[in-house]
Amino acid sequence: MIRTEEMLLNVGPQHPSTHGVFRLVIKIDGEIIKEATPVIGYLHRGTEKIAESLQYTQIIPYTDRMDYLSAMTNNYVICHAVETMMGLEIPERAEYLRVLAMELGRIASHLVWWGTNLLDIGAVSPFLYAFREREMIINLLNELCGARLTFNYMRVGGVKWDAPDGWIEKVEEFVPYMREQLAGYHDLVSGNEIFLNRVKGVGIYSEEDAISYSLSGANLRCTGVNWDLRKDEPYSIYDRFDFHIPVGSVGDAWDRYVCRMQEIEESLKIVEQAVQQFPKEGAVLAKVPKIIKAPKGEAFVRIESPRGEIGCYIASDGKKEPYRLKFRRPSFYNLQILPKLLKGENIANLITILGGVDIVLGEVDG
């Protein structure tokens, strides 16, 4: 008589494929996952509580360290919340610089996902190509704000610095180059039979599951839900650009892959149009006091980050620090469907599924 015993395995918190200090406790029977329990909190720093003792401008660097692969969108959401409370009108040139910074950051973030996800399942070359192009974007953002990862660029009322001479032209040159490389990525990976066998039909969930788990971003759109805040609830100047929202139909790892790859192309369209419409001159920061005091009241805003819907709630008592601040962090919500996705899957698919959800632990733990 053959008898099998279930085994407990720890994936992380120091596993290279968890891309951060994330621990996953799995129970396996042979090679089949029976149960998966995420363990989070290793990177918790209490950002929201710390913010209660900081001035609004001082909070911005802390947002860089949540989703550190897409710091510009985090910068924007806190500024947008305060601006909403104050009723500020943002200068045109600042709006375009914000959009350019956020969309370049979105492309860079998706490049990290593409390269590392493929590296995790055994493809080394794409990782090198992805980081080659990402380095070009990081250099552009470095020229803009003097930092490579934690930018601290946005300000309540606009941005800290104007674009340096020749920067817009460099961004314009980058767009056709990136399109050419993107076509090469598809030639290299998207039609590869081995890759397709690893992602098609793996990690499937329904539209109903996605909505009930509060998923957002590509993790929601892969099921066929056409929802992107840049289109459905336009903020900043996104209503001035012509772009479409990629959606899937099956809700598997392949659909999540396709959605993000197509999002890179759509972000390139936005960048291209923003460069063409970029104002020749103008202020980059509205007239705001050095010490900002939001009026008494509360506000909630939400925007579309590379990982999904990031929100910021502020309650103000009229002082220079927020009375209460709360972030809706998309990675935290997207992570919650992982136990459902992994149950019954082969252990070989674990890393494929985890990489497809695309979490950032700085954002999960907050």
From Swiss-Prot:
Superkingdom assignment: Bacteria
Keywords recorded for this protein, A-Z: Cell membrane, Membrane, NAD, Quinone, Translocase, Transport
Pfam family, one: Complex1_49kDa
Subunit structure: NDH-1 is composed of 14 different subunits. Subunits NuoB, C, D, E, F, and G constitute the peripheral sector of the complex.
TM region positions: none
Protein name (record): NADH-quinone oxidoreductase subunit D
GO molecular function terms listed in the Swiss-Prot or TrEMBL record: NAD binding; NADH:ubiquinone reductase (non-electrogenic) activity; quinone binding
Gene name per UniProt: nuoD
Similarity-based family: Belongs to the complex I 49 kDa subunit family.
Reactions performed catalytically: a quinone + NADH + 5 H(+)(in) = a quinol + NAD(+) + 4 H(+)(out)
HAMAP family: NDH1_NuoD (MF_01358)
Function statement: NDH-1 shuttles electrons from NADH, via FMN and iron-sulfur (Fe-S) centers, to quinones in the respiratory chain. The immediate electron acceptor for the enzyme in this species is believed to be a menaquinone. Couples the redox reaction to proton translocation (for every two electrons transferred, four hydrogen ions are translocated across the cytoplasmic membrane), and thus conserves the redox energy in a proton gradient.
Membrane topology of the entry: Peripheral membrane protein
Main location, first listed in the record: membrane
Cellular localization per UniProt: Cell membrane
Enzyme Commission numbers on file: 7.1.1.-
Single GO cellular component term: plasma membrane
